[in-house]
Structure formats: structure tokens, C-alpha cells
């Protein structure tokens, strides 16, 4: 009988999952209900690129994106409102759960949504050996594509 941890299929499946610690940190950030300013500084390695910026909640990222064009893009405005509602539901559910109260089905669903993306403000994207990259952007990336990370900005 072979060791399941050495099975190539099991090993590939593990690599398809995002880093659990980073996913948990992002998930907790996404449940915040107040604007974050400044965000938590992070540096990520994604596909050979270095991406650094301030981690902000998903709903805030969509809200700031909609502000870039004076709320003229209904899609981003709608997404900001929808994601903010999910964040509010999850935040309320955590508070109720912590004091032993029952939560609604919608609150349970909001808590159960897996965190799949990370959202950065004032992001800078650069290649190894490049002095500076493109800065000041809102950046959204898949958590499972992050191969490494550290708290703080790359230039700090």
C-alpha cells in the first residue's frame, strides 16, 4: 500500500488550494464593515511577478473601483452593494454566533462563501530585477495563484 501523501494526484490537489493562512486573513478582512484606510500592507508572488499593496475588503475594492468613473458603471456599483451586503451579513452572523444566538440562513450562506480572491489598493506590479513597477492600481487576484507572500511592502 502506498502513502497517500506521496500520491501524485493528492499532491497536485493540495497545490490547487490557496495558502490557508493567507486565505483566512483575507476572509477576516473581507468581513470588516468599516472602510479600511490604510489597508494592511502585503507583498505577494504571483506567476513570477511581485505584487505589493494594501489589503482591503472585497466590498471596499468594488466601491473604490466604482468611484474611479464617478459611479457611471452600474455593474461595479451593483457588485459593490452586493458584496457589502454579504460582508454585513457575515459580520452580523459572527457577532450573533459568538454570543450564542442563532443565525439566519442568509447569514449562514454569507459565512459559507469561500474566499477566492485577494484585493489590494495602491498595488505595484513588478518583475524580479525591475526597479519599480506600475503603481497606484486597484488589483484583484486569485488566492490559489499566490505562490508566496509576506506582510509589508516590498520597499519597506
Language model features by range: what are they?
Residues 2-156:
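Conserved RNA-binding domains used in RNP assembly and mRNA/RNA metabolism
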Amino acid at each position: 500500500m502506498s502513502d497517500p501523501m506521496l500520491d501524485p494526484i493528492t499532491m497536485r490537489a493540495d497545490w490547487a488550494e490557496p495558502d490557508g493562512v493567507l486565505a483566512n486573513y483575507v476572509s477576516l478582512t473581507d468581513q470588516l464593515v468599516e472602510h479600511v484606510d490604510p489597508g494592511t500592507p502585503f507583498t505577494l508572488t504571483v506567476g513570477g511577478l511581485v505584487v505589493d499593496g494594501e489589503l482591503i475588503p472585497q466590498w471596499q475594492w468594488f466601491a473604490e473601483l466604482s468611484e474611479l468613473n464617478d459611479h457611471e458603471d452600474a455593474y461595479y456599483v451593483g457588485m459593490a452593494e452586493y458584496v457589502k451586503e454579504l460582508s454585513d451579513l457575515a459580520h452580523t452572523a459572527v457577532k450573533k454566533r459568538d454570543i450564542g444566538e442563532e443565525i439566519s440562513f442568509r447569514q449562514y450562506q454569507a459565512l459559507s462563501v469561500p474566499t477566492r480572491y485577494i484585493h489590494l489598493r495602491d498595488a505595484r506590479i513588478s518583475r524580479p530585477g525591475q526597479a519599480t513597477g506600475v503603481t497606484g492600481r486597484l488589483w484583484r487576484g486569485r488566492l490559489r495563484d499566490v505562490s508566496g507572500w509576506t506582510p509589508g511592502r516590498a520597499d519597506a
